[in-house]
Amino acid sequence: YSNSFLVMTGPMTDIVYSRFSNDRAEHLSIRTDILEKDGKHTVRKYPATPAAAAHIEALAENECVFTERFKGSTLSVNRLELKRNPDGLPFAEIEYLENSRTLEELLDECLQNNDEAGFDKLFDRYCKIAAWKAEGTKQDYDLTFPNICVQGDIWTMIDYEWTTDKLTPQQI
């Protein structure tokens, strides 16, 4: 048994949360940071290795594809800006949605309150969104309840990292 401690000295950092996804294949390993500056939050995704740079760059392409695909639907796509570190490696700066709840939280709340009508309304809207212009386009197979943030009537897709060019079946 041993204890471990990390002591950091120096100026305060803007990072309030950091998650390392280094249990993935090297070309998919990333670090996700949430930063806070002047009361405003931002999300950044960095390649954990140079091999993961293409994975980060693909996020910008995915944002464009899904913004076009969901145009006219009731789903917006979270904004992303691809930037570069001084070493030339890319990172994605993504809008942090303040005062939002995930679709998962809303569905869970309906279940806890025995609100079947509310659950059905949310789930039906989700199904319509998932099927929107699905034929022949890139699919996000992680368009799951926790990856949709809800602010009032605005639904926003917050994660478009895991995609495929194969059609996702509507009936399972």
Feature locations, PLM:
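An alpha-helical support segment within catalytic cores of ATP-dependent transferases
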Residues: 115-139
